[in-house]
Amino acid sequence: MSIIKEFKEFAVKGNVMDLAVGVIIGGAFSKIVDSVVKDLIMPVIGVLTGGLDFSNKFVLLGTIPPSFKGNPDSFKDLQAAGVAAFGYGSFITVAINFVILAFIIFLMVKFINKLRKPEEAAPAATPEDIVLLREIRDSLKQR
């Protein structure tokens, strides 16, 4: 019975609940960032680079089998057929997703830190030499 009680206390603590909410919101936010990159940023980059589509950029590492019936210029078709290919275009897209997500999280943390009240610093401890001088002064006053 004590294990169940301990688990309840652990699960209901603020940190665990905050983490759960953060993971859920993070998952939803990740989808928004993916859409922004895929649907808004990458098409603009494609136009600026003359119609370059990063999602389909790859380097063929193996040979295409004669029985291959898909499009040899399609990374997804080659992957589905088991052909070895290095998909650097997908990596570029994911890297852009990461940079955008990291920047947005940085801005959020910066904003939250601004909202927090600065903690008052504890008064600095009196240096030992000052304490000693005060003791000497007090001792001399008593004489």
UniProtKB/Swiss-Prot annotation:
Q: So where does this one cross the membrane?
A: 10-30, 89-109
Subunit-structure text = Homopentamer.
Q: Which NCBIfam families match?
A: mscL (TIGR00220), PRK00567.1-4 (NF001843), PRK13952.1 (NF010557)
Family, per entry: Belongs to the MscL family.
- Give the record's membrane topology: Multi-pass membrane protein
Give the gene symbol: mscL
Q: Where in the cell is it found?
A: Cell inner membrane
Q: Which GO terms describe its cellular component?
A: plasma membrane
Q: Taking the first listed entry, what is the main subcellular location of this protein, grouped into a coarse class?
A: membrane
PROSITE patterns documented for this protein: MSCL
Q: Name one Pfam family in it.
A: MscL
This protein is called what? Large-conductance mechanosensitive channel
The record's keywords, sorted A to Z, are: Cell inner membrane, Cell membrane, Ion channel, Ion transport, Membrane, Transmembrane, Transmembrane helix, Transport
Question: Which GO molecular function, any one, fits this protein according to its record?
Answer: mechanosensitive monoatomic ion channel activity
Function according to Swiss-Prot or TrEMBL: Channel that opens in response to stretch forces in the membrane lipid bilayer. May participate in the regulation of osmotic pressure changes within the cell.
